[in-house]
Amino acid sequence: MKDLIGREISAVAFVRDYVEFHFDGPVLRSRVDPQVAVGEAVYCFPKPGSRDALCLVIGTTVQSLNLDDSRHLEFTTSNGCRVRLPLGAGGVLNFRADQVLQVG
């Protein structure tokens, strides 16, 4: 997972019931609604404004990544956005640089 630090987020994809963060190869998939903090404002997907806020991370790099008590995966981007991915019940984390990391 720490392999994502320093990587550029090349795309954010909204797919039916999940959101994907693409890193020119690796993909971070959130099956539980992500949150993004832009300054003091917090947007919860799929509420109004959340898609625009999530798109702000496209073209930025991951500066830090934290897994807190196995309940949330959070990363901060080079433009100061903080993305928080809740880990759903039974969520599994698997990561290889050439595969998909699925959260929730």
Model-derived regions, located:
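Surface-exposed, interaction-prone regions used to assemble/regulate multi-protein complexes
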Residues: 1-104
